[in-house]
């Protein structure tokens, strides 16, 4: 029976889904562990939130730089091969961080690591979107986001256990990225449907963004919210007086919120409508920073708010992917997903940089003001689009 599951053609689609989901969740776990470790080490090196924010922007710049080329890479290279190569490349950069403790060098290393991670996520998410049945797409993407958030939560817990100093967190991160190759190698099934030359072009990506602007906006806001959370909220926690272990639990609470919310949000999106749930999630993103401010340094209140805030905000990623899966098919999904990830990269670039400046001007609450303002901007965009579509 077990051999039949591993080898039987009837289970190939499920094996591919499982391998893509496990791979991405391990990658997410490594990301969530190392982002706060990098931020806390940079804070110790420089004492500047601006340096932390700008350095965190390296990963976003790499996403913007490589995302337009991923469809072309997937046109020439089988998806499984590209994912394995990217995971190993990311793993090999990790030991260089503690060996070369310099903010400028870390910027370069994070750029290289970010390119590899971007290729993994564009490939794996396209793979899931192509395989998922249309009627259950948001639910399956919710399950994927749940597994990804589980990886994020595990990364936060690992930070609480391992701390941010010494070699332990770096070695753990290396093992996580390298381990992501195992399900790709062991679980065989349908691969990624490769795009044709026209679908892989830059112009096709621009057209895809124009065809699904709500999805692109969701990626933009999620990129800003998520990366700011992992890059600067550890610094926020430090500046309001939380010890390292409480910061780790705060990060874990936010990531675990993603586990609790993604599948319900996916089911609601399949039943009620993706745009309605997107509006709800965006409103929660606008309100969340105010509740974080009101929580102060009370750990219990802060953990509870982070659980809901980050959990619902993560839903923007699920919803954006579901909208892409609804509007595109086959190889064209690669290009649309690349546009979505590129928008995520732009958000990841702008969010920490702007929030870092805000944090320096209004220490430390400028971070919360910027986070809320970005969500309100996207909520206004959704409202204007709805008014434009309403018949006169």
Which residues does each PLM region occupy?
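Helix-loop boundary and gating motifs at the non-cytosolic
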Residues: 11-60, 215, 227-236, 240
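Helix-to-loop junctions at the C-terminal end of transmembrane segments
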Residues: 66-78, 163, 261-273, 359
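Helix-breaking motifs and short loop linkers at transmembrane-helix boundaries and internal kinks
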Residues: 78, 99-101, 273, 295-297
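Structural signature of the two symmetry-related core transmembrane helices
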Residues: 81-95, 276-290, 372
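Paired small-residue
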Residues: 104-112, 300-308
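Cytoplasmic helix-loop-helix junction between adjacent transmembrane helices
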Residues: 111-146
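Intracellular juxtamembrane helix-capping segments at the cytosolic ends
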Residues: 119-132, 314-328
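Symmetry-related core transmembrane helices of the 12-TM Major Facilitator Superfamily/SLC fold
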Residues: 170-185, 368-383
